[in-house]
């Protein structure tokens, strides 16, 4: 039998969780409210002023389990302004460049906690990560 003395290890979300958010986004507000209600300490980064970098996306996309194209905010004005023919033919490199140049093109919020990256707000997924 192993007996542990001393302080309990911190919960999995003890480090600050990075949330890329847009103040006018209802989904972001819901996600931030949920995180607050579950005592998750967050660092909010405004996604429009500070969109994700290519390096961040290269690390986060595989951890999210979503293909890069699913990171596009298809309901926003920036997306609607894209040339649909060009969008259909776009390679990942071009989509990556768009996402780094226009934060409104990124589906939000983006929540980064350790090895977990969540895109959008899905209460069940948040509960699995943050308990």
Language-model-derived ranges and their functions:
Residues 1-7:
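N-terminal amphipathic/basic-hydrophobic helices that include classical n-h-c signal peptides
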Residues 9-38, 42-45:
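Local sequence-structure signature of Cys/Sec-based thiol-disulfide redox active-site neighborhoods
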Residues 47-131:
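Thiol/selenol-based redox catalytic cores and closely related redox-interacting motifs
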